Amino acid sequence: MGSEMCIRDRETLPQSFPRFVFTAENRERIRFLAGEPDRWRNTRDRALRHLNNPDHYFDVEYLAQYELKTETLSHFRYRFVEQMADARARLKLELPEGNTDHLKGHPGFMPWSINEHYLKLVSSFSYLQVFKTMGTPEEITNAQANVVYRMGILSHFVVDAAQPLHTTEHFNGWTGENPKGYTTSRRFHSWVDGGFFRSTTDPNRAAITKQLNPAALLMRPASRDLASGQFQAIIDYILKQHRLVEPLYQLDKTGKLSKETPDAGREFVQKQLAAGSQMIGDLWFNAWKEAPPDRFLQRYLAQRKLKEE
């Protein structure tokens, strides 16, 4: 759906949110950075593709072959890899053929990617608040620039997750058994991502904004023993979009995602843009609210001040 549309996420933030984010320069910077992770695809180097590509999707259906459920997934990326490796050995699963990037049959890392980028934003807010009281003007400016960077990168993956095709093995046309006759076009993903609006008219930003609520604190699991960041809220968000995969294909099959009869398709995609905007705003807000002062940096800057006196 195009991260660089960049959405209406700032509409959800309170007036007390750091104001430097709202300058024209930083608004444009965030919009530009929202497309940055896709620009990392401009190389054909397999090592970078292997690293970057799985962060953009989470094909929920692939969990079944590993006998894994979303309720039991580790919040930690590499522990999740171990869960899959254990299942592959136990179930004697063979590696897919033609697997040049070593990614076929892999569900992807999108929930972990979003959560990790969220936590990096928490970190950026943590040291920004210390620099604001104890740092130099140059340090404050640099810390603010890092917050803007983290906000932009995080927003990309959240918008990816709002596009239902980023949550399914049917990410670019229906695959496998297809009794309902859904499209198998390899252009379907790009059509939903932006081709649909380019062929009709731009999204109605006012209609998107009407669907937004003020950013709010996200619910935490009852037990925090295994909790990490906002992983559970992110999984819930992704699963909600995954439930819309077949309705999206149904819209296409009935011609309602076409330039000739676009109204229902427009409503659907704008609703997803609103969902992405809401989640981005919520995660930005939570990162700011939850960021503790960077105690290590406080001690370092206090020692620096003593040496200067």
PLM regions: where:
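Sequence/structural segment immediately N-terminal to covalent heme-attachment motifs in c-type
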Residues: 1
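N-terminal, motif-rich segments that launch catalysis or mediate targeting to/interaction with membranes
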Residues: 4-149, 153, 164-274, 278-309
